[in-house]
């Protein structure tokens, strides 16, 4: 991999492109086994999960209906405590199997509130697939993670969709941002 100025802002790489793609293929095999006859609605939580979602879909061997949602319970880096949906689903999920695809579960607040919102729409089933689960000890919100790519340490993660002030998303690796960049 060619070094770029953005790579200089990494303390270290946690997962390279090969690691990420290998784990995505493994997750896709698990998902295919479960969903092969269910025609689920697969919801991408934008913007961070778009890289993971796109690569994951390429390896799934079953019929599905893609959809997208933009939501947050944060303003900047501060939690508002309330879920704001700025782009809702186009698909009616009542009676459908639903898989929410997320980039990372941190405290669990946003996902907890999103799952509560989606559950009110009466899906047949509701599951979560996240690329990363941040190891922060006991999470503030109990979120069931049905499929997880990696457990990452409690540091500022960037690359492959993860951002810092909307930068670094396009790094092809997952890494830890140097503390000097954000302090």
Swiss-Prot record:
Its EC number is 2.4.2.22, 2.4.2.8. Binds 2 magnesium ions per subunit. The magnesium ions are essentially bound to the substrate and have few direct interactions with the protein. It holds the Pfam family Pribosyltran. Keywords: Cytoplasm, Glycosyltransferase, Magnesium, Metal-binding, Nucleotide-binding, Purine salvage, Transferase. It is found in: Cytoplasm. PROSITE patterns: PUR_PYR_PR_TRANSFER (PS00103). GO terms for biological process: GMP salvage; guanine salvage; hypoxanthine metabolic process; IMP salvage; purine ribonucleoside salvage; XMP salvage. The active site is at residue 106. Pathway: Purine metabolism; GMP biosynthesis via salvage pathway; GMP from guanine: step 1/1; Purine metabolism; IMP biosynthesis via salvage pathway; IMP from hypoxanthine: step 1/1; Purine metabolism; XMP biosynthesis via salvage pathway; XMP from xanthine: step 1/1. Mg(2+) binds at residue 163. GO terms for molecular function: guanine phosphoribosyltransferase activity; hypoxanthine phosphoribosyltransferase activity; magnesium ion binding; nucleotide binding; xanthine phosphoribosyltransferase activity. SUPFAM superfamilies: PRTase-like. GMP binds at residues 102-110, 134, 163. Its cofactor is Mg(2+). PANTHER family: HYPOXANTHINE PHOSPHORIBOSYLTRANSFERASE (PTHR43340:SF1), HYPOXANTHINE-GUANINE PHOSPHORIBOSYLTRANSFERASE (PTHR43340). Belongs to the purine/pyrimidine phosphoribosyltransferase family. Essential in nucleic acid metabolism of T.foetus because the parasite is unable to synthesize purine nucleotides de novo and relies on the HGXPRTase activities for its purine requirements by salvaging purine bases from the host. Works with guanine, hypoxanthine and xanthine. This is Hypoxanthine-guanine-xanthine phosphoribosyltransferase.
